[in-house]
């Protein structure tokens, strides 16, 4: 991925670019975006007309690469007395860091909306989302689960559990009666 992106930006044939990296497992998350260090080393190599070796240690990596999860979720659920879910309203605040590293800041909200309560038959849903930019490393990196499914599922099940408890219902029965059929 990096080689193809570099070839495109540098207007060089892909076969003229060599990126050497040890086997670090997978190709997801922090390994996907093009970070400033990559760009600087590539430009230096082009300007100097010789190979440039860029080395990053673990602390530098943690400071400069992205993070995925700094999210606050709040919501409410409309219920009938018998436990049928009538609707949900969700608000999220997401810290995107200094910039959103995957160039698609709507991905978080779309993924959250598609994931939250997907297993349940809910006739009405409303989501508001606010992304903020802070002085942290870049945000928006997907790892351990894409499109914010992890946060959405945790949030969904906590709301379902709280709703069942508020109604004095068995949680398993509450879930069964509201599953998509």
Regions found by a protein language model. Give the residues of each.
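Short, solvent-exposed polar/charged micro-motifs at secondary-structure junctions
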Residues: 27-31, 63-67, 99
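General beta-strand structural signal in soluble alpha/beta enzymes
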Residues: 18-21, 54-56, 86-90, 176
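Glycine-rich loop/linker segments at domain edges
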Residues: 70-159
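Residues that form or immediately flank small-molecule/cofactor binding pockets and catalytic motifs
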Residues: 24, 57-59, 127
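Alpha-helical support elements that line or immediately flank enzyme active sites
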Residues: 1-24, 28-48, 104-117, 144-178
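A glycine-rich phosphate-binding loop feature that marks nucleotide/adenosyl-phosphate handling sites
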Residues: 57-61, 176-181
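Structured beta-strand/loop patches that form or line metal/cofactor-binding pockets in enzymes
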Residues: 52-75
């Amino acid at each position: 991925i990096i080689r193809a992106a570099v070839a495109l930006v540098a207007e060089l044939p892909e076969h003229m670019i060599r990126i050497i990296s040890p086997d670090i497992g997978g190709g997801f998350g922090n390994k996907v975006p093009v970070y400033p260090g990559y760009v600087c080393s590539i430009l230096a190599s082009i300007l100097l007309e010789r190979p440039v070796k860029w080395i990053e240690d673990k602390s530098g990596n943690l400071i400069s690469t992205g993070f995925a999860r700094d999210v606050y979720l709040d919501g409410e659920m409309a219920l009938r007395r018998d436990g049928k879910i009538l609707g949900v309203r969700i608000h999220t605040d997401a810290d995107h860091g200094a910039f959103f590293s995957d160039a698609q800041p709507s991905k978080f909200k779309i993924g959250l909306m598609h994931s939250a309560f997907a297993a349940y038959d809910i006739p009405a849903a409303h989501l508001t989302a606010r992304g903020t930019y802070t002085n942290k490393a870049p945000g928006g990196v997907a790892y351990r689960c894409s499109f914010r499914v992890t946060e959405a599922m945790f949030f969904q099940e906590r709301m379902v559990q709280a709703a069942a408890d508020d109604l004095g219902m068995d949680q398993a029965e509450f879930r069964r009666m509201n599953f998509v059929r």
